[in-house]
Swiss-Prot record:
[4Fe-4S] cluster binds at C58, C62, C65. This is Biotin synthase. SMART domains: BATS, Elp3. It catalyses: (4R,5S)-dethiobiotin + (sulfur carrier)-SH + 2 reduced [2Fe-2S]-[ferredoxin] + 2 S-adenosyl-L-methionine = (sulfur carrier)-H + biotin + 2 5'-deoxyadenosine + 2 L-methionine + 2 oxidized [2Fe-2S]-[ferredoxin]. InterPro entries: Aldolase_TIM, BATS_dom, Biotin_synth/BioAB, Biotin_synthase, Elp3/MiaA/NifB-like_rSAM, rSAM. NCBIfam families: bioB. The gene is bioB. It comes from Caulobacter vibrioides (strain NA1000 / CB15N) (Caulobacter crescentus). Catalyzes the conversion of dethiobiotin (DTB) to biotin by the insertion of a sulfur atom into dethiobiotin via a radical-based mechanism. Pathway: Cofactor biosynthesis; biotin biosynthesis; biotin from 7,8-diaminononanoate: step 2/2. Signal peptide: none annotated. The keyword Iron-sulfur applies.
Length: 341
């Protein structure tokens, strides 16, 4: 394996990424922390909120997702929210300390008929002074350009897992289709938000495969969310994890964060779904290993996040501060409810 440096590379081999995972834990975290400090203030954490603007009824069969129409999870499908309601949630998120506001819709792909309403939402949220992000399923090249023109800064489209395990997660969308959407986003001039989920029954080689894919993209993701599976009853992967009682090992989760930081040194590595189930000590280790972004707001889709008081106390105890330093960790009581990327 080549010497670990803080300089971005796009020529990582899968063997090199696997070798990073195999480093002694203390050495891996040390190297990741060094890379992190070369590009970021380790005491600064970015705060984001992600609102579900259209929940449930998705045609995809992603085996972890409560929003899939293929599974009976008790989730009620809703129509696309009105722009005024979305803007009100965004304003509350901004006033509560969020720097980025993400809008998510449970669609396989964006339909042109929904573009006018979405571009209106994006423009009005942008006018609040927030960074804007959306996750709306697959995009065409023209749709990506329209979203960019409306003021969208970031587009989220996760790879979910490594290519070899992907068929065990979803069969209604190909890996290449995900890569194609990311290419449309880049070509339109938007920043990419792309990561995956761990704890779905995959092996370490699959986690390495995911990070290898991300590290060898033409441009590293600007934001790299790492989600820990929150098993939801009624979903195939959730039921499997619940029945077997097997969650990803906490140390292995930190390893994943550390490797992500090393192979994508300038990306914002985000602790996403699953943070509610993490101890304070585990979150601290993740921050030490290079995570520097979290979701706030109390809820991610159908799964909980730590409350405002918990996050405020965690930041105080770890001497952390919101990125930019001008916003509060505490969210107001009416802060927007948020949904998972």
């Amino acid at each position: 394996m080549s010497e670990i440096t803080a300089s971005p590379r796009h020529d990582w081999t899968l063997a090199e990424v696997e070798a990073l995972f195999a480093l002694p834990f203390m050495e891996l975290v040390f190297q990741a922390a060094n890379v992190h400090r070369a590009h970021f203030d380790p005491s600064e954490i970015q705060l984001s909120q992600l609102l579900s603007v259209k929940t449930g009824g998705c045609a995809e069969n992603c085996g972890y997702c409560s929003q899939s129409a293929h599974f009976k999870t008790g989730l009620k499908a809703d129509k696309l929210m009105a722009a005024d309601d979305v803007v009100a949630k965004a304003r509350a998120a901004r006033d509560g300390g969020a720097q980025r506001f993400c809008m998510g819709a449970a669609w396989r792909e964006l339909k042109d008929r929904d573009l006018p309403k979405l571009t209106e939402m994006i423009g009005e949220v942008k006018a609040l002074g927030l960074e804007t992000c959306a996750t709306l399923g697959m995009l065409t090249a023209d749709q990506a350009k329209a979203l960019k023109a409306a003021g969208l800064d970031y587009y989220n489209h996760n790879l979910d897992t490594g290519p070899d395990y992907y068929k065990d997660v979803v069969t209604t969308r190909t890996y290449q289709e995900r890569l194609d959407t990311l290419a449309h986003v880049r070509d339109a001039g938007m920043s990419t938000c792309c990561g995956g989920i761990v704890g779905m029954g995959e092996q370490r080689r699959d986690r390495a495969g995911l990070l290898h894919q991300l590290a060898t993209l033409p441009a590293h993701p600007d934001s790299l969310p790492i989600n820990g599976l929150v098993p939801i009853s009624g979903t195939p992967l959730g039921d499997k994890v619940l029945s077997e009682g097997k969650a990803i090992d906490a140390i292995e989760f930190v390893r994943t964060i550390a490797v992500a930081r090393i192979v994508c040194p300038k990306s914002m590595v985000r602790l996403s779904a699953g943070r509610e189930g993490m101890s304070r000590e585990l979150q601290a280790l993740c921050f030490m290993a290079g995570a520097n972004s979290i979701f706030v707001g109390g809820k991610l889709l159908t799964t909980p996040l730590p409350g405002q008081d918990e996050d405020s106390q965690l930041f105080q105890d770890l001497d952390l501060k919101p990125m930019g330093g001008a916003v509060r960790v505490e969210a107001k009581a009416d802060a927007a409810m948020v949904a998972a990327e």
